[in-house]
Amino acid sequence: MNRFFLSILGSLALVFTLTLKGAEKPTHSAVTPAPREGGWMKRHEQFNQNVQAHQGDIDLIFVGDSITQGWEGAGKAVWETYYGHRKALNLGIGGDRTQHVLWRLDHGNLEGISPKVAVVMIGTNNSGDDRNTADEMVDGITAVVHKLKAKLPETKILLLGIFPRGENFNDQRGKILQVNQAIQKLQDWKRVQYLDIGHRFMERSGSIPKAIMPDFLHFSTAGYGIWASAMEKRISTLLKDRPVEMTHADFSGEWTFSIQGPNGQMVDSPLNIKQNGARIRGSMTMGPDRSFALEHGGIFGDQIAFTITRDRPQGGQMIYQLKGTLKDQRLEGKVTAKMDGETTTIDWSAKR
């Protein structure tokens, strides 16, 4: 047998080996369906009850982790505005990774339903250094998409790029960028569409403002407003309904902030608000020449939220978390004051 023939056989053997290897299914943790314990199972079972109760009456589902679950918390008002009329169901569980979603999809979360659209945003909890590589994350997300396609043959899938996390660029963000670049290839415009809106949550410098993500991972109400707005056109097109047109009230200007003091008397303070879309900044003056910046400020519709941090002369801090609603050019709301582990909530108001 001559050398040329042997080399041909060797090349064919190598190609055959690589083909078999490429055909093998990955077996790492991100693609191995796995349940969790405790409250997770209780929420999973509640999902199963929900889908049973709404058989044939669900048009839109959201599949994900704590960021998706947060539609029931900080994102509740946004959800009601954008999805309350759309027969939508939230299937997000805090802490979930791709393997946990895979298990849920096999154990009742999709039983008997056929939504028009499934929004998927999963993977950030797989991105820790000791968890999965970028390639493994891609495998996990791909497995979730394939599972949805198989179990929901009539459903269009809107796959979202994993949202950025961390105040500034870091290794974890870098890994997420690699993953997003790869999973966009799952888009076929027939069953799967891909949408990356991560830039909507960042400043031009690449930093993430606390007004959008207070802990640089989970959204504030304003953050959920940005999320909903960014994908509304795509959602509306897929559902074949009228898009939601959201406008924010104008909070800009000089206000007089009023709150009841320790002696029962009303105390007035100047409040300055500057608004840029769903974000706000500004200051409040308390006492002579003591101005405090409005932190983590954001708005949604006619609702506003911000935080003020005040250093105490004897040490420590007072943290005031304010939420309010604009009614006939008057702001009314609640302020929660936190100090030394104790919390107090009282009413406040403001007028221009």
PLM regions and their residue ranges:
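Structural recognition of the beta-strand scaffold that forms the well-ordered cores
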Residues: 59-64, 87-92, 116-122, 156-161, ...
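Oxyanion-hole/transition-state-stabilizing segment in secreted/luminal serine hydrolases
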Residues: 69-84, 98-142, 147, 158, ...
